[in-house]
């Protein structure tokens, strides 16, 4: 079977639970056609470079798929029909990544920086409450 990386963008007004149910639906399509989804990553809501179908933001999701081409074609057909999916892109790869993608690593790095900034504020005596001294 062929290996694929598949990214899709869901509308911004869809909830995270609805995105998870979409992922489960598309996993079911792949598995029903003889494939399997190796890894899923939800990258969260991100700004788009330009408006797509009147949306400025979208839920970004990555699926690593090991499936025959027919299974992928069926999943893409269902994505074209869905109004909640703005765009999708599927790329055939030689090997699937097992570690977190670059987007997840960037998010972890940003969260770590935010925690360090918070620690520095605490060390400087900043508590966030301006009326504490009065």
From Swiss-Prot:
Region (Disordered): 99-134
Lineage: Bacteria, Pseudomonadati, Pseudomonadota, Alphaproteobacteria, Hyphomicrobiales
Gene: rpsF
GO CC term, one of those recorded: cytosolic small ribosomal subunit
Biological process terms in GO annotation: translation
Source superkingdom: Bacteria
Cited NCBIfam families: S6 (TIGR00166)
Compositionally biased intervals (Basic and acidic residues): 105-134
Protein name, UniProt field: Small ribosomal subunit protein bS6
Species of provenance: Methylobacterium nodulans (strain LMG 21967 / CNCM I-2342 / ORS 2060)
Keywords: Ribonucleoprotein, Ribosomal protein, RNA-binding, rRNA-binding
InterPro entries reported in the protein's UniProt record: Ribosomal_bS6, Ribosomal_bS6_sf, Ribosomal_S6_plastid/chlpt, Transl_elong_EF1B/ribsomal_bS6
């Amino acid at each position: 079977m062929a290996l694929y990386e598949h990214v899709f963008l869901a509308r911004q007004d869809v909830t995270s639970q609805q995105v998870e149910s979409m992922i489960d639906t598309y996993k079911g399509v792949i598995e029903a056609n003889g494939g399997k989804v190796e890894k899923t990553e939800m990258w969260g809501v991100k700004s788009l470079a330009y408006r797509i179908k009147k949306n400025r933001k979208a839920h970004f999701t990555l699926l690593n798929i090991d499936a025959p081409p027919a299974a992928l074609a069926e999943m893409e057909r269902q994505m074209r029909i869905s109004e909640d999916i703005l765009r999708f892109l599927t790329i055939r790869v030689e090997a699937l990544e097992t570690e977190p993608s670059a987007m997840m690593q960037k998010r972890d790095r940003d969260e770590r920086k935010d925690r360090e900034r918070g620690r520095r504020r605490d060390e400087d005596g900043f508590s966030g409450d301006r009326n504490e001294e009065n």
